Amino acid sequence: FCNQKIYNAEIPESLNGALLVTNHISRLDVVFLMLSTKRKDVIALTASNYRRALFFGTILKKLGVIWLDRGESDFKAMRETADYLKKGWIVGLAPEGRRSRSGKLIKAKPGAVLIAMKTGVPIIPVGLVGTADMGKAIRKWRKMDVTIKFGEAFYLPEQEENEHNRDYVERALDEIMCRIAVLIPEEQRGFYADHPRLKSLLAEIEEAKATTES
């Protein structure tokens, strides 16, 4: 039902636990995310209100997900996530915490940073494009065009001396979101479009390209 392009989705079996962090533009995001890599030990956090959805809920239950009660601190889901990571699983989540109706990045919540701080696992950014177009595709009797780009794994930046915890979490969260923003078109970067860290990452990419071509 879609034309799908997937880039750099090879997650080595030797990678023992990692967070997959992605932008969130569609209910289908978690399905595409979990099926885009060949690794079988992949699970994702998903809002518990989808559990009762007849069609979509059935798919999610079959895939296997961690149900998250959105809008409150779901410590059970956080503990379950940490347990999977400690067992070496790959866990997907959307740092924004909810679907962006505009398709553009919205300000993220600190959950992804707190999990990464607790577990120390690497983080793999993923950019999703086109997953929100199912309704449009059905109306026009055509396939969806979906692009999924995986970035390089990275670790949270180190906390600086005398840096307040709240400031550090915000800086680490910006790092995660800017690494996602690099993987999606400019018009989807939304809240993070003008972030200095994003500009720095884009400059690094251009510099690497120039070095390769010379």
Give the predicted meaning of each segment.
Residues 1-3, 52-63, 136-145:
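Alpha-helical membrane-targeting segments
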Residues 1-15:
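N-terminal signal-anchor transmembrane helix
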Residues 3, 17, 41, 145-147:
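A residue-level signal for beta-strand positions that form part of recognition/binding surfaces
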Residues 76-214:
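Non-catalytic C-terminal accessory region of glycerolipid acyltransferases
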Residues 10, 24-25, 48, 71, ...:
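Short, flexible active-site-adjacent loop segments at beta-strand->alpha-helix junctions, enriched
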Residues 12-73, 80:
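Catalytic core of membrane glycerolipid acyltransferases/transacylases, capturing the structured
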Residues 2, 40-42, 63, 89, ...:
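A structural micro-motif
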